[in-house]
Amino acid sequence: MYPSAMSILTLKVNGRSQQVDVDPSTPLLYVLSDDLELRGPKFGCGLGQCGACTVIVNGQATRSCVTPVSTVGSNEITTLEGLGTAEKPHPLQQAFIDEQAAQCGFCLSGVILTAKTFLDRNPRATDEQIQQALASVLCRCFGNVRMLNAIRRYAGGRTA
C-alpha cells in the first residue's frame, strides 16, 4: 500500500474559510469531524444510506461520508452548527426545540438539513411530500409526530 499524497485545501465551512492538510480522497465527514471538530454530521453507515452525515453543499443535502473532500472545492458547506447558534437558533432548529422533536438526536443533522434544503426549493410542500423527501434519512423515531410538527411549523405553521 502506498501512502497518499496530502494536499492543503481551502474549504468554506459555515461561512468561514478553513485550510486543511488532508489526503484529497478523505471523506468530507472525517475532515469536518476530525480536523474541524464539528459534531453535527455523524458517522452512521459509512455508505451514504442513512443520512446521519448530511451537510449542505451549495444548497443541496449531501452525504458527507461518501463525498471526497477534494470534490467540494470552494463550494459553501453548511453543517448543523452553521444554521444557528445556541443563543440564536435557525427557525427550523427553534421549531424542533419548541416541539420537543429530538429524541436521541443522532439523525438530526440529516433530518434538519434535508428538510431545510427540500423546503427551500418547495416552500408549500405537503406532509406527504415532506415525508417522501425525508424517506432517505433513517431514524428510529421519525414516526414521532413531533418531528413532522416541527417541520410544519418551520414551513409556515400548517396543521395536519
Tell me the role of every PLM-derived stretch:
Residues 1-160:
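Signature of N-terminal electron-transfer/Fe-S-associated modules in redox systems
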